[in-house]
Amino acid sequence: MTTQNFLAEIGTEELPPKALKKLATAFAENVENELNQADLSFEKVEWFAAPRRLAVKALGLATAQPSKEIEKRGPAVSAAFDADGKPTKAAEGWARGCGITVDQADRIATDKGEWLVHRAVIEGQPTKNLLVDIISRSLANLPIPKMMRWGDKTEQFVRPVHTVTLFFGSELIEGEILGVKINNVIRGHRFLGEREFTISHADEYLTALREKGMVVADFNERKALILAKSQEKATALGGVADIEEDLLDEVTSLVEFPNVLTAKFEERFLAVPAEALVYTMKGDQKYFPIYDKDGKLLPHFIFVSNINPEDPTAIIEGNEKVVRPRLTDAEFFFKTDLKQRLEDRLPRLETVLFQQQLGTLRDKTARIEALAGEIAAQIGADKAKAERAGLLSKCDLMTNMVFEFTDTQGVMGMHYARHDGEDEEVAVALNEQYMPRFAGDELPKSLVACSVALADKFDTLTGIFGIGQAPKGSADPFALRRAALGSLRIIVEKNLPLDLEDLVRKSAALFGNKLTNANVVEDVVDFMLGRFRAWYQDEGIAVDVIQAVLARRPTKPADFDARVRAVSHFRTLDSAEALAAANKRVSNILAKVEGEISIEIDRTLLVEAEEKALAEQVISLQTELAPTFANGEYQTALDRLASLRETVDNFFEKVMVNAEDANLRRNRQAILNNLRNLFLQVADISVLQ
């Protein structure tokens, strides 16, 4: 089989930087899928992406589809010919559909008789004839939320397309994609190198772009270069660069030929909380801040330019000039905000709606204050501090700094609270109330902060569900999924003795008569348990393990987690499959019993040795494991219950549960009822596959 390397590049105007990597990887995945569907073998598909281009390269792509042998069976010979031996209409119709005559058909003998059959070899198409359609479909299926048209064209794409290049080895593929004729023209850097040049082979692409066009097309290479140079520059200044993955990807998506430089700002700005300065540098300017070895912000920053002059002084001074007004604003807002205490901003919260039916932010803080105190009392936190933090929790939203730099909410509340002389735990809780802010984020450290964070999240969950506005589809305007998962993480990872039903019920009571959903407690709890499913699936825990625990609907998250871990462990035991099957059998037997099933085992009715053995072992385990269940030691309990396997197997092999004698039958059902209840103390293991 002969192969060639295949290149496809789509040259565009500047692509959205936050979407570039996602578009590029999706493009490569789509091409892989299309090649597989076309039955074209290849070694691997590489992807490249820069601000003005998306490209893929399929290495070792077969030059043609493989030939396929087909066998199309027709009617039985007995039905294919009439009494005179002439083909019937059924046979002629089948042959016509195969493109042959009846006498050209082969015959195949089976144990059910002889049949007509058409055998043929379909030659595979040359790969080059399929590539335009493969790329067109791959582009059409990209995750582009908003398309655009350009010029007088009817075609749509994420940005206007100017060039399309498809090479299969040294052959330029002819055709048109997105209304643009395919050619061998590659556009270089907008300001450096050759603006346009041509290539004559798929393998020339990367080298020609770098040497002629001054473009590093490999996204990951560009990213690694920026990271290494940034760390090198920071080290030279005696610091460490703060380089978040998402920002690094975005900066990588903004430049074609990265030039990493450093600049500085006036030291007086360091009097402003570092978070506000960093917000400006990262969010607005896409700069990387630099910290010293003690974690203090230095008056320097790293930026990445898309041009590379011999003397970068003008570029550096330009970036310093751009950032100065933003830092000056932050300084002004900070100094102005310090003139008023956080507590004095409480009345202004009455002017801001949280939600039309649920009242103002002042109403919300009153509810958070009360619920945070309740939670603190349950988990051993300082109730007064939790209530104080709850009261002040939204005051920083009324400050100039947070109004201008919204992502500093919470952290600025902490700084202002410290300035006001609030207790340190209260101040820190104002920042940590929003944790975790995203998947994998750190949790609140103190129990006071946990109390406020949970109170805030449960207030939102209960309130929004309470007015019938649960998330639908992908829409989640109040970020309820994040609030639910964040709450679960706090309770589970901090091992807090909290019950979801209790928390929602207490939260609902604080809304007075504002809630219209009578099932709010059940709805919120079900929603949160559903988030457990997503959490554990992300961890790789089997779905049937989660379903086994969900069947018991434990509403204490820490307890729920302990059950999941125990069942997940139990599932690995040799006896698990047999005991799961036995529990399923028991469940089916008991489901058919009319009326209430007793749990009283009458030892005088134990006839068979096997039922005696099972009854005695079940009774013994009930006594032995009672404290184990009470302490939530579910893995220990299931390990002991695994010892039932042989006894249960023997019981089902030798004992007739539905005996004719009603007393024997009811007693055996009672044995099984007790057996099942032992396992149900942890989960419904009959669900396990």
Curated annotation (Swiss-Prot):
Q: Does the keyword DNA-binding apply?
A: no
This protein is called Glycine--tRNA ligase beta subunit
Which NCBIfam families is this protein grouped with? glyS
Which example biological process does GO assign this protein?
glycyl-tRNA aminoacylation
Which keywords, in A-to-Z order, does the entry hold? Aminoacyl-tRNA synthetase, ATP-binding, Cytoplasm, Ligase, Nucleotide-binding, Protein biosynthesis
Could you give the subunit structure recorded for this chain?
Answer: Tetramer of two alpha and two beta subunits.
Q: What Enzyme Commission number(s) does the record list for this chain?
A: 6.1.1.14
- Does the keyword GTP-binding belong to this entry? no
Q: Which top class of enzyme applies to this chain?
A: ligase
Q: Which reaction does it catalyse?
A: tRNA(Gly) + glycine + ATP = glycyl-tRNA(Gly) + AMP + diphosphate
The similarity comment for this entry is: Belongs to the class-II aminoacyl-tRNA synthetase family.
* Gene Ontology molecular function: any one: glycine-tRNA ligase activity
- In terms of superkingdom, the source organism counts as Bacteria
Any one GO cellular component localisation term in the record: cytosol
The record, for InterPro entries, names: DALR_anticod-bd, Gly-tRNA-synth_bsu, Gly-tRNA-synth_heterodimer
PROSITE patterns for this protein? AA_TRNA_LIGASE_II_GLYAB
